């Protein structure tokens, strides 16, 4: 082995570039060892100021102790070769076919991949290597305190699998519930319990004349059914136009509508206006528990069900006859009895809600919309003379009329319906029947006959402002036939008044 001075000269950077080309490989290999010592001694072992160790060596972590093992290629960037003892031969370090080229001026020798097995292996520990070659930075102990949190999480990861899985299932259930809540909207249920078609309110003829609540309510229903203000396609009509169609003459303020306006009168006026505009419709009593034309077999719950369904139907309109007044139901609300059911999911039973009926008012002396309990309306309709209940003044309670008549009640709910079926034209009827009807104008059973023109003298017509035109009598036979056909097809036979009074 060459001495230290020769090795120092051989490895000196200033002279390494002028190394003789005919130097033997053994001498070159031996000269690489001091070079390694020099580079190793100059390499900083202690960590840098930032607390990190040199990045040229790979780091391997274990649970007990963390080492950084420098492999045989760890210092290739420093171009050094490592060997265990100086007695290694060329055949041990280099393969037979390995030789230095004549033009190679570098001072470093390439080492095959099998050199690591010769330098150190699993049987040679780090202590033997350090005693033979001095203290080398091949391995050092690293402070692993900064990795404790990570290793702790890794250690307990397998133990928390079930807990994490249960948490995931819980979160999935919450997420599914939230998605269902997002898809579900209480608006649909609220719309079923709170119904108010603003078009019905738009069509309320307000204000009315002094006693024209009947014709004002009728025009409100007709405009909703047939005009563009409601569900139809015709121009809306006014009270004055309707009164002119019915034969009344101004001044309308002087007409006393009360004595000749009844339930069947409104039905007949409805048919006359329909005939004038060539539209189809029918009318019938929805609920009248007492008196003439009462709806036998109809119950309050059944009437409520029909009324609420009809208020959702744009082909139906209603008039409520109360104490000395007519006005139009336009909506309702089914209020839950319990507070926690305000936005309940799904429909509620009739026992869980209380119904309020919204009623449009034509008189300017009262609120535009009344809101009355259905129970109070039922009480009003079920009272009989001389007892009565004024639905617009519930604070007065049950009252008694000064009358000798006992029993019966005129109060009721009347329905008006727009029909889509086509009635037979004039040419479809057998002319002999029409001629016979015109020659023998008899009262046909099933036709409502209330305070009609047939029962009112010409003198009374003049006093009431009624225009008793000849066209009314000319059209009477046709109207009788049309009314018969209309009632037979619609199936409503509930509003007969044989006494001619309502």
UniProtKB/Swiss-Prot annotation:
Region span, Disordered: 1-32, 438-460
Main location: cytoplasm
GO cellular component: cytoplasm; nucleus
Compartments, record wording: Cytoplasm; Nucleus
Keyword Cytoplasm appears in the UniProt entry: yes
Regions of compositional bias (Basic and acidic residues) in chain numbering: 12-26
Keywords per UniProt: Cytoplasm, Nucleus
Family assignment from sequence similarity: Belongs to the BIVM family.
Protein name, UniProt field: Basic immunoglobulin-like variable motif-containing protein
Originating organism: Mus musculus (Mouse)
